[in-house]
Amino acid sequence: MSIMLASCIALVSSLVLTVIFLPVLINFMHSHHEGQEIRDEGPKWHQKKSGTPTMGGTIFVIAAVISVIWVAAWQHSLNKVVWILVISLLGYGIIGFLDDGIKLYYKRNLGLRAWQKLALQIIIAVVIVLIASSDHFQFGLYIPFAGVVHSIALFTIFIIFWLVGFSNAVNLSDGLDGLATGLSIVAYGTYAYIAFKQKNFAVLAFCMSVIGGLIAFFIFNHKPAKIFMGDAGSLALGGGLATVSIMLNRPWSLLLIGIVFVCETASVILQVISFQTTGKRIFKMTPIHHHFEMLGWSEWKVDIVFWLVGLICSILYLAIWG
């Protein structure tokens, strides 16, 4: 069987599992009166979303993990790369699950403490490095203008920075109905194409499994959202994306393919620096999607424009570097 056909089966499997079990989670949360607490610092009109079921990411993460494992096993391709990708998605998903669970239990918007979340994110990244190093993985990192540097210490630091950074970047982007979902479909779709060209079945099947779950999730997450992915979804998606870029030996590609995630994070950093040094804010509100909301843009307009930016930049990357 061709790698594309097998990967498409993984996509359909993940999609079907998510479509079946997501309504179950939604109904369960409604029946137990559980839902997302909306932060007071956000746009005031977001308060009407308070009580919307959350933790939807739990479903599509589990669906993707089940799908990629059984399809890879079926194709006799359940190798270390598959396990590294699964651990990144599941590991960061578990961190998000804990964060979401604390928020729901205590009926507040604060889950894990920042240092607790960071420590757990670093641990998952280190575990991935240890698994990779046990199989004579090539620890080569391309540094612009310096070439490839072979250093396990440098590579470890980079992986920690990349996984922690992008898991949080996707998390910051998950502030509007459907926004992070659409952006992630574009990014994972781009990497699926790259993996197909490289004939990398493990990464292709993984990306397609995630895409299948996200397509199904989007049915329930577009505006007005019936459920949010929560940190269980956003942290998992970001950690998975960062790991995919590394497994394809194209980590820097994520700066362009994931340009919206980068801009969302940069807007928060710049806002903090500006306010602490000058007492003035650069943006009306951060992350930057809220800035455009404050300018009068509808959620749908922000979503569509941001999705298009992500899509155009992904196409641009493929056009230049293939």
UniProtKB/Swiss-Prot annotation:
EC class (word): transferase
Residues spanning the membrane: 9-29, 54-74, 82-102, 122-142, 145-165, 176-196, 200-220, 227-247, 255-275, 302-322
Cofactor(s) needed by this chain: Mg(2+)
Pathway(s): Cell wall biogenesis; peptidoglycan biosynthesis
Family matches, as InterPro entries: Glycosyl_transferase_4, PNAcMuramoyl-5peptid_Trfase, PNAcMuramoyl-5peptid_Trfase_CS
Subcellular location(s) of the protein: Cell membrane
Catalysis performed (reactions): UDP-N-acetyl-alpha-D-muramoyl-L-alanyl-gamma-D-glutamyl-L-lysyl-D-alanyl-D-alanine + di-trans,octa-cis-undecaprenyl phosphate = Mur2Ac(oyl-L-Ala-gamma-D-Glu-L-Lys-D-Ala-D-Ala)-di-trans,octa-cis-undecaprenyl diphosphate + UMP
Keywords, sorted A to Z: Cell cycle, Cell division, Cell membrane, Cell shape, Cell wall biogenesis/degradation, Magnesium, Membrane, Metal-binding, Peptidoglycan synthesis, Transferase, Transmembrane, Transmembrane helix
Major subcellular location class: membrane
One Gene Ontology term, aspect cellular component: plasma membrane
UniProt record, GO biological process: cell division; cell wall organization; peptidoglycan biosynthetic process; regulation of cell shape
Entry GO MF terms: metal ion binding; phospho-N-acetylmuramoyl-pentapeptide-transferase activity
Membrane topology: Multi-pass membrane protein
Alphabetical list of Pfam families matching this protein: Glycos_transf_4 (PF00953), MraY_sig1 (PF10555)
Enzyme Commission number(s): 2.7.8.13
Signal peptide residue numbers: none
Family stated for the protein in its record: Belongs to the glycosyltransferase 4 family. MraY subfamily.
Function noted in UniProt: Catalyzes the initial step of the lipid cycle reactions in the biosynthesis of the cell wall peptidoglycan: transfers peptidoglycan precursor phospho-MurNAc-pentapeptide from UDP-MurNAc-pentapeptide onto the lipid carrier undecaprenyl phosphate, yielding undecaprenyl-pyrophosphoryl-MurNAc-pentapeptide, known as lipid I.
NCBIfam families listed in its UniProt record: mraY
Protein name (Swiss-Prot/TrEMBL): Phospho-N-acetylmuramoyl-pentapeptide-transferase
Gene: mraY
